[in-house]
Amino acid sequence: MTTARYCLLLSSLLCFSLLPVALLAEEAVMLEGEALTRVVPGSFYFEGRIGPTQMRNAAAVRFGEKRHIIAALVDTSGYSSDIRAKYEGFFITDSRITFGDKELAAGAYGFGVTKESKFNIFDVGGNLLLSVAGAKDSATRTPRPLALLKEDGGVRMYRGRSFV
């Protein structure tokens, strides 16, 4: 093998070995104002109904140029009581993520949080896809109804004092 080919092979291997590190290093940017309203849908479909988004209770995070995590509460007043009991809002991710200790594929989902801080993720048909035990943040004095916050090198989703 010539020196030029050896150097080319070595540099190619080095570039490809650093690619996952570069993808993981994408900084989380919290979206606000106009940037937030551009990515958060005005309403969300769930179990045959459309509920308007509560923009005051919406949050989004961007990683790099095209990866987003979006969450918002939805006005469920037009839903039946059994749907309102399990569905509080929507959660959208355009790439595979780890949600708590479980993997979640790219997609748009409904979510609800139980009194025991269990985060439940549903498909738009209302079928439970995963359930993750959350924790309580008792140090927060005035919790927001919904928030996405950068924590410990990742992003936490808060529903009141409960988070995952």
What spans do the regions from the language model cover?
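Bacterial N-terminal signal peptides
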Residues: L9-P20
